[in-house]
């Protein structure tokens, strides 16, 4: 353990426990009420374990056990652990989308850490929105923290084929729609694709965000790829518990070490992974909580320099477990050293130049080099930024996952005002659609849905699937699962619900996309758009009460991170008075 910099009386929790007052008496009394001895908590760093465990969140179903491992580490290092449940925001089960609740998790995390006698925290999460939500809240409170990622699930296997969560779900669902997979095989696939605890085993949003957190310095170095079911995972969790006690004594709050260079390291890893487009939104939100300005232009500039190096689904052919045993994050970062700020020290105080010096790569096909990428910059990028009269504030596309023929495309729009209409009509044999048609879904953004669900990978109409078409140009103000693929333009800003031009496009308008030029336009004159705007009537549902109402009133647009306008970096909130 490093030399202590703080004295016991400087611990934040001492305000609750140390004074000879009636209020501090009550605090000490209540801990003894549950069977704790004074010597177990007095004069020790109080470590919160923010746990997103839930029986409705399969990705986090093991985090109750991991919390016990963290506690072992905290006790061993001389701290006092307390487990605090927070909402799980696990994908799949939560409707309409977990994105609706990311900011709520951030608020919950921040206020728990502020309102209780906490000196530092271990953040237990992993599924998509849990990582940014926990980090955003922790950054706003600014206590020493370590992120303990849930870890990816084991490789999927089905009839001799390696299968990845999300990626193959989409592929096989299209085959089932065509009658190529019967019910017996379909039900068999349910139990074969997701075989263990943990997050998606592809480069989805979960693995993208935990890897970014790792590269930025919030985890124990290299922790992000450890499989959830591996014995190394609880050992890592215990180490997190020991490490956070050390960080408290050293006062390693994020504000003392996190800089724009740390964010840039996270961005570089994001691009090299071929990561989820969702990370663009989350990274902007995380950076802004730390008072660091990050824009879509900066993300796109990094994507234009760093090709996709990970040979993992959906861009490649392997899975996260393979990546871990090929060397994991340290091996990947060593391959992109020219694009990193190696002097950056993370929460633990270790710099990347020392951590990468001896980082081995055991499989150069899974973790490629800059001169032998999985997807070259000429073939596509992790993130392409588009602007034009359809998206003046920007839209994004994962061009590395799109068909080459559609990266420069013109075609007539087929517009759907809501997801229900889309679902009802998409397989109608009479639907007027060709391989050149541009499918558009609107009112599916942050305000319009609300919560910006992952509806952006619009299904291919059945009549086109039957004709052999497997990709179409699709545009929406919603998001897409990081496990998916296809020519999908996402995060159109401003969204339709706040009056963005997407609200004005009509079926039959010609849409022009040029990924290389970074443009997305509709062939409609300014005068005609003005006429349409004058007669426009908003189509989205509005909420008068509940969290959805708060969300619609205060959420920012995709290019701004979809945070609440009152939660971004600003004046520090004072410590709570104790009376």
Curated annotation (Swiss-Prot):
GO terms for biological process: carboxylic acid metabolic process. Gene3D superfamilies: IlvD/EDD C-terminal domain-like. GO terms for molecular function: hydro-lyase activity; iron-sulfur cluster binding; metal ion binding. The keyword Ribonucleoprotein does not apply. [4Fe-4S] cluster binds at residues 59, 127, 200. It catalyses: 6-deoxy-6-sulfo-D-gluconate = 2-dehydro-3,6-dideoxy-6-sulfo-D-gluconate + H2O. PROSITE patterns: ILVD_EDD_1. Induction: Is highly up-regulated during growth on sulfoquinovose, compared to growth on glucose or succinate (at protein level). The keyword Transcription does not apply. Binds 1 [4Fe-4S] cluster. It is an enzyme of class 4 (lyase). Its EC number is 4.2.1.162. SUPFAM superfamilies: IlvD/EDD N-terminal domain-like (SSF143975), LeuD/IlvD-like (SSF52016). Keywords: Iron, Iron-sulfur, Lyase, Metal-binding. Catalyzes the dehydration of 6-deoxy-6-sulfo-D-gluconate to 2-dehydro-3,6-dideoxy-6-sulfo-D-gluconate. Is involved in a degradation pathway of sulfoquinovose (SQ) that allows P.putida SQ1 to use SQ as the sole carbon and energy source for growth. Belongs to the IlvD/Edd family. Homodimer. This is 6-deoxy-6-sulfo-D-gluconate dehydratase. The lineage of its organism: Bacteria, Pseudomonadati, Pseudomonadota, Gammaproteobacteria, Pseudomonadales.
């Amino acid at each position: 353990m490093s030399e202590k910099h703080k004295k016991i009386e400087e611990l934040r929790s001492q305000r609750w426990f140390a004074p000879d007052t009636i209020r501090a008496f009550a605090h000490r009394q209540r801990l003894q009420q549950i069977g704790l001895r004074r010597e177990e908590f007095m004069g020790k760093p109080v470590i919160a374990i923010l746990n997103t465990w839930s029986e409705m969140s399969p990705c986090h179903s093991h985090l109750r056990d991991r919390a016990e491992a963290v506690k072992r580490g905290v006790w061993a290092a001389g701290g006092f652990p307390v487990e605090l449940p927070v909402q799980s925001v696990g994908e799949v089960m939560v409707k309409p989308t977990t994105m609706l609740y990311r900011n709520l998790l951030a608020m919950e995390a921040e206020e728990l850490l502020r309102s209780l006698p906490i000196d530092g925290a271990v953040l237990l999460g992993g599924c998509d929105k849990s990582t940014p939500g926990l980090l955003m809240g922790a950054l706003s409170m600014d206590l020493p923290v370590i992120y303990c990622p849930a870890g990816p699930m084991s490789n999927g296997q089905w009839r001799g084929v390696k299968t990845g969560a999300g990626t193959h779900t989409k592929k096989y669902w299209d085959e089932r729609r065509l009658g190529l997979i019967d019910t017996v095989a379909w039900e068999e696939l349910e139990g074969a694709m997701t075989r263990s605890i943990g997050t998606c085993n592809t480069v989805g949003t979960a693995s993208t965000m935990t890897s970014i957190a790792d590269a930025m310095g919030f985890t124990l170095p290299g922790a992000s790829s450890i499989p959830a079911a591996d014995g190394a995972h609880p050992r890592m969790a215990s180490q997190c518990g020991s490490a956070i006690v050390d960080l408290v004594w050293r006062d390693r709050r994020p504000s003392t070490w996190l800089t724009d260079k740390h964010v840039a390291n996270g961005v570089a890893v994001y691009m090299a992974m071929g990561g989820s487009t969702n990370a663009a939104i989350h990274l902007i939100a995380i950076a802004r909580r730390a008072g660091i300005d990050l824009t879509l232009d900066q993300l796109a500039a990094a994507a234009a320099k760093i090709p996709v190096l990970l040979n993992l689904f959906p861009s490649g052919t392997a899975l996260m477990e393979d990546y871990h045993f090929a060397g994991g994050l340290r091996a990947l970062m060593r391959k992109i050293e020219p694009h990193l700020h190696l002097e950056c020290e993370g929460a633990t105080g270790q710099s990347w130049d020392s951590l990468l010096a001896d980082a081995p790569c055991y499989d150069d096909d899974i973790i490629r080099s800059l001169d032998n990428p999985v997807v070259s910059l000429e073939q596509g990028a992790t993130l392409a930024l588009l602007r034009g009269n359809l998206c003046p504030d920007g839209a994004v596309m994962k061009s590395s996952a799109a068909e080459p023929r559609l990266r420069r495309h013109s075609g007539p729009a087929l517009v759907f005002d809501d997801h229900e209409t889309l679902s009802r009509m998409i397989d109608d044999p009479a639907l007027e659609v060709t391989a050149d048609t541009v499918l558009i879904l609107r009112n599916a953004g942050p305000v319009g849905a609300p919560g910006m669900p992952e509806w952006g990978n619009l299904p291919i109409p059945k009549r086109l699937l039957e004709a052999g078409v497997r990709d179409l140009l699709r545009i929406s103000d919603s998001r897409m699962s990081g496990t998916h693929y296809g020519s999908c333009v996402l995060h159109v800003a401003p969204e339709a619900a706040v009056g963005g031009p997407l609200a004005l496009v009509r079926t039959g308008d010609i849409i022009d996309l040029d990924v290389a030029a970074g443009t997305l336009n509709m062939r409609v004159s300014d005068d005609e758009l003005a006429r349409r705007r004058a007669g426009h009537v908003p189509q989205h549902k509005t909420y008068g009460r509940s969290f959805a109402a708060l969300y619609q009133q205060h959420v920012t647009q995709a290019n701004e991170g979809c945070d609440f306008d009152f939660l971004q970096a600003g004046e520090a909130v004072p410590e709570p008075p104790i009376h």
